[in-house]
Amino acid sequence: VSAVDGAAVADRFVSEIEQVEGLRCLPLNRTLAAMRSLGMTGVRDLTQAYTLMRTLQADGLVLGTVTEWDPYKPLRFGAAIEVVSAAEGSDRRPLDLKELTMPTAESIGGQDSSRAAMSQASRIFDGRSHETLQELERYSMGRAAPDSGSGERAYEIRIDLFTRFGAFVLLRDLLEQEAARLGVPLVDGKAERVP
């Protein structure tokens, strides 16, 4: 049994977000450093999410969990992700650490769970599934090194590349959900990168 390296998986998501035109993502190490400074080992609720967003001065936070992990062929990767967005008109001032001693909604900018702005996506990518393999083939075209021994099949045998593929698909799904939530039109209703 192989343990999941959560930081490596999160880095795949950061990399994929950075490739979306118009989006910027803070480096994972900066987010982890901010969490350590706040005494957080994870983001367990919206209060913590909004506190972290204010500390980072970020517009949103992508949270996720790995739901399936098998790094041996046939590869299997599953994840659930969500984006928590800062509410319109929310307080963008840097977090005053004294506020952390007052755990009320008002002390974190008035955010509460009844006004949470979120979009979610989840999937399981199974290396035995015909649907997954077809989507993986479309994704790997032009991305694989043609001079490597495994070529495009590298995405079927290397968990790091398979996870990158999963991150791409999940983020595409998440962007489509977020666009629908915000009423932003997408070309053909899809959040696809232009080649």
What are these regions (language model features)?
Residues C25-L63, E68-G78, P146:
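Short, solvent-exposed, polar/charged sequence segments at loop or secondary-structure edges
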Residues R12-L23, L52-D59, V84, F168-R181:
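Structured segments of extracytoplasmic/periplasmic soluble domains
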Residues L75-R76, A87-P195:
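C-terminal/domain-edge helix-coil "capping" segments
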